[in-house]
Amino acid sequence: MEEFQRYLKLNRSQQHYFLYPLIFQEYIYALAHDHGLNRNRSIFLENVGYNKFSLLIVKRAIERMYQYEQKHLILFDNDFNQNRFFGRNNNFSFQMISEGFAVIVEIPFYLRLLSSLEKKGIVKSNNLRSIHSIFPFLEDNFSHLIYVLEILIPYPAHLEILIQTLRYWVKDASSLHLLRFFLHEYRSWNTPNKASSFFSKRNQRFFFVLYNSHICEYESIFVFLRNQSSHLCSTSSGTLLERIYFYGKLEHLVLVEAFAKAFQANLWLFKDPFMHYVRYQGKSILASKGTPPLMKKWTYYFVNLWECRFYLWSQPGRICINQLYNNSLSLLGYISSAGLNPSMVRSQMLENAFIIDNPIKKFDTLVPIVPLIGSLAKARFCNVLGHPISKAVWTDLSDSDIIVRFGRICRNLSHFFSGSSQKKSLYRIKYILRLSCARTLARKHKSTVRAFLKRSGSGLLEEFFTAEEQVLYLTFPRASSTSHRLYRRRIWYLDIICINDLASHELNDSLV
């Protein structure tokens, strides 16, 4: 994000209110191109034969948009489906401009982040981006809580809701008009079945900008309700948006006055100073030390917030009330739970000795072994029972490439699940990947696994055994014994900014 300040060279007032002219600036699309939103091939290529993008394509596309809008009145034309600007086989212009538009709309969010960091005196915020940074917070604060609300945040059902929400963050009317055109035109040629896959796979940045603006509005009101219901109001309401694209939010609440007054009369009855809120992957957790009536009250507030402010119908099962000690949470690829660990303490007074049972509350994180094996089976590393099989599609690669790919997956999983308190599940995953690699190599050479390993030597798959130790030796180089002890403990890394594909159970060949 630091590139924006170098490329844009605009003051803050200009970035807030004059975003529309940036659509015609070539470096905006160069930024979107350099970010590598599409891994295989950029959408900004003029055609397959030219490795460059053209600003002229962008200008021509925008000119056609407004000519089309003036001629056909796209918001009110009855024959809209027959007069589409973006046809079913011509989504090139939509992709190109939407990704550039997403880069531009990110500017107000980034400025709010800079202002928030300056006020709080935070020089570097890279560590806050790490997914692992949330687990130490949970360990420190969730162990003494009792109830938890598991909330599935609803998506806006109407396009105008997204536009009205984004209006609070982007003050440029021309950009909002262009966004309205994008969304209505997009809806006209995409069926409901195609919409989610199109946004998630081809327009990720555009999707997250819209989603984050919706989340900002939703959580601003929630922070207000939280402060009104607490004896000690929080001094900072800075929250993190989706960590794929990281922003911060100021202590600036965009509220509807009528909505605030409607809830303020009853909030004083339920004071709860012990409450923590965490959001991840379209879900959120509200943990409290309160009582069941208090949690039901918050459920009532959330349902009314969605229906009254965002016009969203709350479906059954979107909010679940559970006891933290009796239920586990599927959180960012881990299975987390808060339980009581028994601890025996021997106490002696004069000649009498006593053994005291002193259970300790502990927030634990485990590897979800069953879903992880299911992901490995989906990627054809093993069958549904966890028995390793050969990766047939990789047999055309060289031996070194096959070993490197398997080793990279093994290291990434070990790195991501380093915070697990039980490493035995990781040993099983390593065994599956190691044997799958051996069977893939044996299949390539038309041999058995035993014969291939005997011919190649035992050091062929050595990197599977030493991957974690090498990482720990680099981190703690003083003594090998220290590394072995740390390997058995939980380690949270601050360089993990996205969930491993296997952990999120969404596999594809881009895993490696």
UniProtKB/Swiss-Prot annotation:
- What would be an example GO MF term here? RNA binding
What are the subcellular locations of this protein? Plastid, Chloroplast
Q: Which GO terms describe its cellular component?
A: chloroplast
Q: Any S-S bridges, and between which cysteines?
A: none
The family database entries (InterPro entries) matched by this protein are listed as: Domain_X, Maturase_MatK, Maturase_MatK_N
Q: Name one GO biological process term.
A: RNA splicing
- Keywords from the UniProt entry: Chloroplast, mRNA processing, Plastid, RNA-binding, tRNA processing
Q: Which PANTHER family match?
A: MATURASE K
Primary role: Usually encoded in the trnK tRNA gene intron. Probably assists in splicing its own and other chloroplast group II introns.
Family that this chain belongs to: Belongs to the intron maturase 2 family. MatK subfamily.
Protein name, per record: Maturase K
The organism's taxonomic lineage, starting at the top: Eukaryota, Viridiplantae, Streptophyta, Embryophyta, Tracheophyta
